[in-house]
């Protein structure tokens, strides 16, 4: 039982204090509930608690569901990558802390690889930062360089963490949509999606600090052309703006297309941070290693964020990754190089998925890069009007499909700001970096689905 004083006020007149005996049951609040009221969330994370991955990964956890939602590979990893990790685990000093900004052998390997690509010398100690995945690189960049009140331009649809990361920094996301110039009756590809240069320029202001670029793009699979990148570069230079370039799918580009690094364009190196990912490069998403590459005057601010948060990344993983890179750096012109063999393998899987989607009346957007394929589900005519939810149609459709067809995907409106969601809610995203048996299971679901429609 608790003893407390209750002060009573009536019509502005102060009454004498009286003692009241009460219990927590009378108040109807448990101790944890009272603590929850007392210790609320920090304002910087207000409204950021919803996450598409938490919700839909849980739905796909049922073993009977074929998971084409979350973007993790279930294909066989390169054996040499696994072998290098095994070796590293048995070296005593590789099980201890390493350099906080990147294991020496890894930053040297990255310097060698990207030095060849950029055709310039990259300082491994000053111009490269190894991070906790591409997420870590994005977080470091935004926290280290974006101030409250700044504006950050984001193209829609966008990888879902961009918006909340910008808001956590107290900044304002400014959105511009990619629009499709699709012609009915023709093959729909990610190249059909582009931005309007005049509309993009209108988004720049005196408050613009940065633009976030994603190429190859998730979820659409767009590979930005040199001409498109030049428009972005010219605007960044004109408005003295940073470019945060998320290029984690850089090696996954398909026939007829080429990945171009925006930092390689004239005048862009000094204002660009380029993000890479071990998970996407070597199909090891669970390693959670990424990197930022850019000029020392920008990287140093990202280092400050890292040293006051995670400080360093796992040593044996970095050491193993370095050795894997050296193996493929030495054979970059060889078809067996993983940078070359993986996109060829995935192009076959992409084409297979496109056929499967077409077979049930879904209209796919053929990606030029990445390992996701989007489909328009409106032609299926699945009536979900009786579902009691104010969620966008694609959210309800994916939940319905997961429950009734045992096939999971991700709603594309999850990659949109609130204003753009209605324009994308008939699209869903499927992942195709899956082993053949997984795609076989998906094919069987599609075949059964199609036969029941007939």
Swiss-Prot record:
Pfam family, one: Aminotran_1_2
EC number: 2.6.1.7, 4.4.1.13, 2.6.1.63
BP term (GO), one: L-kynurenine catabolic process
Entry's Gene Ontology cellular component terms: cytoplasm; mitochondrion
Superkingdom to which the source organism belongs: Eukaryota
Keywords on record: Acetylation, Aminotransferase, Lyase, Pyridoxal phosphate, Transferase
Cofactor: pyridoxal 5'-phosphate
SUPFAM superfamilies: PLP-dependent transferases
Keyword Lyase carried by entry: yes
Modified residues (N6-succinyllysine): 116
Gene Ontology terms for molecular function: cysteine-S-conjugate beta-lyase activity; kynurenine-glyoxylate transaminase activity; kynurenine-oxoglutarate transaminase activity; protein homodimerization activity; pyridoxal phosphate binding
InterPro entries (UniProt xref): Aminotransferase_I/II_large, Kynurenine-oxoglutarate_AT, PyrdxlP-dep_Trfase, PyrdxlP-dep_Trfase_major, PyrdxlP-dep_Trfase_small
Residues annotated with N6-(pyridoxal phosphate)lysine modification: 280
Record's catalysed reaction(s): L-kynurenine + 2-oxoglutarate = kynurenate + L-glutamate + H2O; L-kynurenine + glyoxylate = kynurenate + glycine + H2O; 3-hydroxy-L-kynurenine + glyoxylate = xanthurenate + glycine + H2O; an S-substituted L-cysteine + H2O = a thiol + pyruvate + NH4(+)
Residues modified to N6-acetyllysine: 116
Involved pathway(s): Amino-acid degradation; L-kynurenine degradation; kynurenate from L-kynurenine: step 1/2
General function of this protein: Catalyzes the irreversible transamination of the L-tryptophan metabolite L-kynurenine to form kynurenic acid (KA), an intermediate in the tryptophan catabolic pathway which is also a broad spectrum antagonist of the three ionotropic excitatory amino acid receptors among others. May catalyze the beta-elimination of S-conjugates and Se-conjugates of L-(seleno)cysteine, resulting in the cleavage of the C-S or C-Se bond.
PANTHER family: FI04487P, KYNURENINE--OXOGLUTARATE TRANSAMINASE 3
Name the UniProt record assigns to this protein: Kynurenine--oxoglutarate transaminase 3
